[in-house]
């Protein structure tokens, strides 16, 4: 295979990133749970759906702008929450945040970030407007959750994105085989500043990561959402919904947006692909909350397919990590710009100049 020095698509970024990352880090980022069936399906479903272009439409001016929860975006994508970004580059989440903000798009920061939520917010504050959400869990230690929410609100995050598909960690066999640990010098930056945490001593692994895994709460129910919403006025986004009845219930319990997601295929192997779940969820929500989607986005045409079925925007994950590994902020910026260019070209070729006009008539399902 010819060596790739300047990637021209997201798949080439993945190939090049492998040469920049340790095997343990690459496997952590790329792997799914179990046999990785859901991981593969997230991509395969986009390849199965074909497009039906319209001809002789004026596409001389393509408009990619949209909004999510009233916050403007220059294109319909956000950076998905991803842990441990300093595994890919020393600037980690700071580089990602700078790239997202400079492109006029949004970023969802993971609780398990290796740069603190305050540091990342400061980067975003240099751009106006800047869309940053904070991803979190409701931990067994409610004091930990409360502290994170209060810090996110004080730092200026625009929404709380609650991950609901992780009552326990999925069976990620590559990580087990590699005995995955955080390298020396990397920390869960959002937890190191919280006093009073009972961090276990775990030889050969990160005590903080062990503590976090123990804090996942399999006893959570819908009723716990009321407590979370009482902590701040920030809108609540639920990430990890795959059923229409759950989506309808999310709206009843106050969610302002839903991210249709199977955690990148990293939780329940054999779960439905995100795009396959999207139509039922859009119908169930019926315009009462905004619907977003993550999982499998690699091309501008993929974004069109998700929007046609009813997503307001999409989130991209692993390709951002590949860009980060290859070139830091510049690499992430290039990944975003590649998708933006592909989306712009695809919009012209399907005969549609406005995102709001994309619908299922453009799809061959």
Curated annotation (Swiss-Prot):
Claim: Oxidoreductase is one of the keywords in the record: yes
Official protein name in the record: L-lactate oxidase
Cofactors named for this entry: FMN
Naturally occurring in which organism (per UniProt): Nostoc sp. (strain PCC 7120 / SAG 25.82 / UTEX 2576)
Active site: 263
Annotated coiled-coil segments of the chain: none
Gene Ontology molecular function: any one: oxidoreductase activity
Principal EC category: oxidoreductase
């Amino acid at each position: 295979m010819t060596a790739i020095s300047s990637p021209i698509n997201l798949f080439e970024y993945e190939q090049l990133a492998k040469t920049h990352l340790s095997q343990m880090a690459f496997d952590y980022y790329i792997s799914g749970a179990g046999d990785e069936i859901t991981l593969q399906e997230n991509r395969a479903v986009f390849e199965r759906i074909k497009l039906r272009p319209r001809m002789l439409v004026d596409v001389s001016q393509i408009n990619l702008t949209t909004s999510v929860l009233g916050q403007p975006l220059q294109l319909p994508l956000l950076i998905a929450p991803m842990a441990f970004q300093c595994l890919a580059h020393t600037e980690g989440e700071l580089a990602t945040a700078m790239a997202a903000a400079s492109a006029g798009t949004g970023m969802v920061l993971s609780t398990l970030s290796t740069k603190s939520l305050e540091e990342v917010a400061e980067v975003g504050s240099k751009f106006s407007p800047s869309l940053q959400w904070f991803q979190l869990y409701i931990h067994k230690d409610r004091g930990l959750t409360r502290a994170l929410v209060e810090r996110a609100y004080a730092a200026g995050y625009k929404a709380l994105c609650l991950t609901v598909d992780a009552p326990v960690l999925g069976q990620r066999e590559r990580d087990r085989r590699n005995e995955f640990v955080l390298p020396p010098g990397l920390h869960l930056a959002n937890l190191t500043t919280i006093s009073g945490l009972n961090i276990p001593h775990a030889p050969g692994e990160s005590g903080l990561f062990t503590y976090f895994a123990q804090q996942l709460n399999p006893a959570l129910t819908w009723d716990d959402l009321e407590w979370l919403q009482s902590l701040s006025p920030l809108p609540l986004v639920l990430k990890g919904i795959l059923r229409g009845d759950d989506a309808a219930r999310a709206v009843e319990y106050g969610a302002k947006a839903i991210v249709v997601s199977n955690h990148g295929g990293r939780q329940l192997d054999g779960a439905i692909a995100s795009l396959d779940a999207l139509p039922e969820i859009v119908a169930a929500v019926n315009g009462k909350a905004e619907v977003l989607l993550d999982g499998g986005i690699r091309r501008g045409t993929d974004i069109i397919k998700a929007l046609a079925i009813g997503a307001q925007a999409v989130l991209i994950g692993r390709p951002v990590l590949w860009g980060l590994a290859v070139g830091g902020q510049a690499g992430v910026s290039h990944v975003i710009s590649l998708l933006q260019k592909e989306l712009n070209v695809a919009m012209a070729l399907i005969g549609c100049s406005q995102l709001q006009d994309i619908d299922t008539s453009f799809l061959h399902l």
